[in-house]
């Protein structure tokens, strides 16, 4: 894989406006329009709590996964918020980073 074809986004916020009006919109358009071949989102900090507790955000996550975007989450963050099993059950790779 050419590193110039891969986008990594570190998602740290629990602000829903940022998720829907920037992150999700950009990654889905990037994938659909071929701006990047490989898109990876890393959930870090408070973002894991938001994803675990908000069904609207979970629906958006599933759409991203179905479009071929990879999503990973920091295992330590998930454990700190007590959401590791929820995040894993969404199909997100949870690992130490």
Which role fits each region the language model picked out?
Residues 2-8:
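Extreme N-terminal starter segment of soluble prokaryotic enzymes
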Residues 8-21, 46-52:
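Short, glycine-rich nucleotide/cofactor-binding loops
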Residues 20-33:
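Histidine-anchored nucleotide/phosphate-binding helix
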Residues 23-24, 55-58, 87-89:
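Short, glycine/charged-enriched secondary-structure capping and boundary segments
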Residues 27, 38-44, 71-77:
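Short internal beta-strands
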Residues 33-51:
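Short, glycine-/small-residue-enriched flexible loop/hinge segments at domain edges that mediate gating
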Residues 55-84:
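A glycine-rich helix N-cap at a beta->alpha junction
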Residues 86-97:
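C-terminal structural segments of small proteins and small subunits
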């Amino acid at each position: 894989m050419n590193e110039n074809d891969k986008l990594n986004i570190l998602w740290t916020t629990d602000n829903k406006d940022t998720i829907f009006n920037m992150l999700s919109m950009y990654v889905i358009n990037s994938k659909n329009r071929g701006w990047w071949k490989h898109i990876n989102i890393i959930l870090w900090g408070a973002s894991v709590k938001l994803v675990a507790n908000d069904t609207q955000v979970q629906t958006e996550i599933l759409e991203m996964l179905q479009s071929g975007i990879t999503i990973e989450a920091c295992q330590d963050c998930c454990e700190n918020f007590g959401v590791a099993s929820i995040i894993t059950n969404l199909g997100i790779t949870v690992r130490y980073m």
